[in-house]
């Protein structure tokens, strides 16, 4: 490896924080040098990953009856302050616009931290009858929160550049509950497409979304054993409907308050994907979101160079016709330097074609995730590449799933939990009482994620705080 390449080597992934920060700029995901804390710039390569990721999100939502929309960024203070419990959760994080030019505004305007108070005044005007339901809208927007904690690109931001928020309206509490369940499944499907296995749980009441009846959440296990919240789904009951006077005419002619849900997902989805799959060489991307899915490396010698380049161009055109995003690296860099470059960018599949390969009418494929080499006959290159993509996708998911499950530890004592959460997620019996939950968090030094949506109970057990019998276990973890 050349000296310049040594200088550009990533820290090992086991040094996760340094690895993550270096990878973001070495793979050209984000530039962190913007002169405002917590605001970052997408490189074109990173933005292409973002675009493909959000295309998946749009596809899954659109196919389940959601419609995309767009609401304003600015929220009048009088609307923003209507929902007291909701505002209590955000009041210290709001950016306020107080002037237009040199003139003071009569009503200050909030930069949305989230859009309930922007959308629900419009729902009051739009909702008329039970026949209007369900309303299932979503938007993908930037949101702003004055984070005072340590910011980290894609994970903790002052400007969330890619916030997908859905807001639904229903006739009954039960209809809204069914929508929550659907949303959890949709998010699970989104992450399955990203080859990211998830933990699904119901947050404890003290950690639910401000103003919600309850919150279900999706978490990913990061390489350092901490969990990252990568999706939330909130049952709002009729709380916001009462605040914003969202009523409908029921079949019996009575006016009733609507019931609502909201659910969000952000660029943390990308943070989880690159963190879980990446390795010491750089990104390892699922084929569906890779800006370059195949890179063709011509193996050039003086003799037969034109024939090799012509064959590479032919393969490129054939793959493009099947929808594959493919590049040829015919630069003057030596092959090892080319491999380094494209491995850093996580290109799922490398094809090498040289004079000997042409004689045998094959291309040599090299998988980014495993390094496995295999010949693909050139007449079958299209089907061969697509089969490799499917194998890579399945392999990434299964590897991540095994990794997640191997780091979930069922515990019975709080001291054991303190030890195990240094490696991953612990489960522990809990009676359900708030005072016991808070005492547990205090003694463990970590938070209760929530009650698994797929129960992990082992029959009757005892709460480690009060000794009461319970069949419920909760996830406990260190979190981002």
Swiss-Prot record:
Q: Does the keyword Iron-sulfur apply?
A: no
- Coarse class of the primary localization is cytoplasm
Query: Looking at the Swiss-Prot or TrEMBL record, what is one Pfam family this protein matches?
Result: ProRS-C_1
According to the UniProt entry, its GO molecular function terms are:
ATP binding; proline-tRNA ligase activity
Cited Gene3D superfamilies: Anticodon-binding domain, Bira Bifunctional Protein, Domain 2, C-terminal domain of ProRS
Q: Where in the cell is it found?
A: Cytoplasm
Which keywords does UniProt give here? Aminoacyl-tRNA synthetase, ATP-binding, Cytoplasm, Ligase, Nucleotide-binding, Protein biosynthesis
The EC category is ligase
Task: Give the EC number(s) under which this enzyme is classified.
Answer: 6.1.1.15
Q: Respond yes or no to whether keyword Protein transport is given for this record.
A: no
Q: InterPro entries this protein is in?
A: aa-tRNA-synt_IIb (IPR002314), aa-tRNA-synth_II (IPR006195), aa-tRNA-synth_II/BPL/LPL (IPR045864), Anticodon-bd (IPR004154), Anticodon-bd_dom_sf (IPR036621), Pro-tRNA-ligase_IIa (IPR002316), Pro-tRNA-ligase_IIa_arc-type (IPR004499), Pro-tRNA_ligase_II_C (IPR016061)
One GO cellular component term noted in the UniProt record for this chain: cytoplasm
The record's listing under CDD domains reads:
ProRS_anticodon_zinc, ProRS_core_arch_euk
Catalyses which reaction?
tRNA(Pro) + L-proline + ATP = L-prolyl-tRNA(Pro) + AMP + diphosphate
Superkingdom of origin organism: Archaea
Any one Gene Ontology BP term: prolyl-tRNA aminoacylation
Q: Which PANTHER family match?
A: BIFUNCTIONAL GLUTAMATE_PROLINE--TRNA LIGASE, PROLYL-TRNA SYNTHETASE
UniProt domain comment: Consists of three domains: the N-terminal catalytic domain, the anticodon-binding domain and the C-terminal extension.
Quaternary structure per UniProt?
Answer: Homodimer.
Q: What does this protein do?
A: Catalyzes the attachment of proline to tRNA(Pro) in a two-step reaction: proline is first activated by ATP to form Pro-AMP and then transferred to the acceptor end of tRNA(Pro).
User: What does the similarity note say?
Assistant: Belongs to the class-II aminoacyl-tRNA synthetase family. ProS type 3 subfamily.
Record's protein name:
Proline--tRNA ligase
* Organism in which the protein naturally occurs: Methanosarcina acetivorans (strain ATCC 35395 / DSM 2834 / JCM 12185 / C2A)
The protein's gene is named proS
